[in-house]
Amino acid sequence: MDYTVEEKEAFMREALKEAEIALENDEIPIGCVIVKDGEIIGRGHNAREELQQAVMHAEIMAIENANASEESWRLLDCTLFVTIEPCVMCSGAIGLARIPKVVYGAKNQKFGAAGSLYDILTDERLNHRVEVETGILEDECAGIMQDFFRNRRKK
């Protein structure tokens, strides 16, 4: 499903709410929502410190929630909105879940796997390719990360 700019911004604001939850828990503030037919079916935020699990990234949590909601591992006809460009692990999970579209706010120059450092989501050698859109609420998404790391360096 294609969404208007206003709808995309609204869903990204929901992802930013998830990032705020991560921030409150002293986690790297990344948030994610998965949308199907205009409804959020999965939410997630970074929870590695809280759960002491290296793989608990926002996208993984949102995919698990959406899988439970849909009672299926296939998330066809869904769009994943995430505040920061997915990493290699999350890009792999997105492909394995058969999510057809990812919208992310800000680039991840150090770990990005959706065009910045690597380009896993659109790699033609893989059996599932994902449409990628960037820049929705980019300043807000980048800002929460920049503030987090600026404050962390002061500690």
Model region roles, listed by residue range:
Residues 1-25, 73, 86-155:
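Zinc-dependent deaminase
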Residues 15, 19-22, 32, 42, ...:
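Small-residue (primarily alanine) positions within well-ordered alpha-helices
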Residues 28-30, 78:
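Short loop/turn microsegments at loop-to-beta-strand junctions
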Residues 30-38:
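Short beta-strand scaffold segments in enzyme catalytic cores
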Residues 36-37, 64, 76:
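A cytosolic small-molecule/anion-sensing beta-strand core signal
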Residues 41-48:
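Short beta->alpha transition motifs characteristic of CBS
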Residues 50-60:
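A short, polar/charged loop-to-alpha-helix boundary motif
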Residues 72-84:
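Immediate flanking context of iron-sulfur cluster ligation sites
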